[in-house]
Amino acid sequence: MSADPTVPQLLVPLAEIGDRGIYFEDSFTSWADHIGHGAAIAAALRERLDPTRPPHVGVLLQNTPFFSAMLAAAGMSGIIPVGLNPVRRGAALARDIEHADCQMVLADTASASTLDGIEHVNVDSAEWAEVIDAHRNSEISFQNAAPADLFMLIYTSGTSGDPKAVKCSHSKVAIAGVTMTQRFGLGRDDVCYVSMPLFHSNAVLVGWAVAVACQGSMALRRKFSASQFLSDVRRYGATYANYVGKPLSYVLATPERPDDADNPLRAVYGNEGVPGDSERFGCRFGCVVQDGFGSTEGGVAIARTPDTPAGSLGPLPENIEILDPETGQQCPVGAVGELVNTAGPGRFEGYYNDEAASAQRMSGGVYHSGDLAYRDAAGYAYFAGRLGDWMRVDGENLGTAPIERVLLRYPDAIEVAVYAIPDPVVGDQVMAAMVLTPGAKFDVDKFRAFLAGQSDLGPKQWPSYVRICSALPRTETFKVLKRQLAADGVDCGDPVWPIRDQS
């Protein structure tokens, strides 16, 4: 295989595999039959698509064999799937469909309710089953794709505004699958457990692509379930799993049993896990967990090493620097700035139909991640939030993530989100939303005493207000919707406690 593999190159061997394939609920489909399903989908869609327009097809599906077969169809035919987020509804979802130039939308029954009258094909319907049956004997052929050719459009989470459609090439997807396969020594005897949503880059690049690259099997779950995670791993013999965000925390919150480590899981890979969860998860379930740092765009990637301090993203790689957003100069040790790839775009291939956003991301010929971080004297990086999270408090720029890490030490806190609300005079005030352990009552004096005892929390970093929530609003990929919390402000339906002296 060439240094830059493509998705078709990974798919070709699967067409001959009859003893490994897709596990889903109580069913099993061999790779050979799965590739045949992909060929039928490709043929059916080609009949319906206008060849003079981009062959873009919106996909609004849970993690089902059809979604995986649709990805196979894309690799075989050049049809471009566009992952649609079920959290988006009505006009917002219609905007995403139009923005990506989707000629049609495929949805399953479980997801179709979010379309609110938008025209679509229900892939669970008898009519669609007849269409696929009519193409069951379609020729299994694979396009001769170039590594740089577009494979899929994947929308960003849109936590700070309208999501952007990230271009994902064949090489971007295939290299991720091959890299993970080699890193963890995966092969034909392995089973990859994929429960993260396939409309998101994490599930496609380090879930689906890994299963395809290693030529083992894949176990799909419609939606992630913490309570069913371990039973699924045992049921399907899963040896590898991926995650994004909080799933490790949710699994760790399930009741611990003495036989938790009695399972086939060997390796877990993901990003944006809670600091410390990787070690706790690996110890409890007897597996290796690697947490990386990156985004759908792929312009900056940081990997933890065995000697990485707790809470750190890992050592700054060559050409990844922390720069002052205003001056463009390198930040000194301990100062918060933007993570920038000074060597160029990395794996960023642009946003579809948004030249302005693409140009802004590559302003000055370097890749601007929009992520804030700081480094210690040894060169290890620490996440400090997003540029949109930057707070201007009493004339000083503050990142949200360092404050969140401190507040998570509070004995009664299990989830924390820090965000800015307008200061009545000028700038911002710090506000924190907290979820407490079951049965805990918020004690404002106890909390103030806790803050006073934290040597790494400055006076300006103290929250002006704390909101006590039953749950934090999140996206389908478990990212906190801070813009929603900020919009609520202090006049919300939850208890809000003033903390910092406002005088």
Curated annotation (Swiss-Prot):
Coiled coil: none annotated. GO terms for cellular component: plasma membrane. Pathway: Lipid metabolism; fatty acid biosynthesis. It catalyses: a medium-chain fatty acid + ATP + CoA = a medium-chain fatty acyl-CoA + AMP + diphosphate; a long-chain fatty acid + ATP + CoA = a long-chain fatty acyl-CoA + AMP + diphosphate. It comes from the Bacteria. GO terms for biological process: fatty acid biosynthetic process; long-chain fatty acid import into cell. It holds the Pfam family AMP-binding. Its EC number is 6.2.1.2, 6.2.1.3. Signal peptide: none annotated. GO terms for molecular function: ATP binding; long-chain fatty acid transmembrane transporter activity; long-chain fatty acid-CoA ligase activity; medium-chain fatty acid-CoA ligase activity. Keywords: ATP-binding, Fatty acid metabolism, Ligase, Lipid metabolism, Nucleotide-binding. Catalyzes the activation of medium/long-chain fatty acids as acyl-coenzyme A (acyl-CoA), which are then transferred to the multifunctional polyketide synthase (PKS) type III for further chain extension. Belongs to the ATP-dependent AMP-binding enzyme family. This is Medium/long-chain-fatty-acid--CoA ligase FadD17. The gene is fadD17.
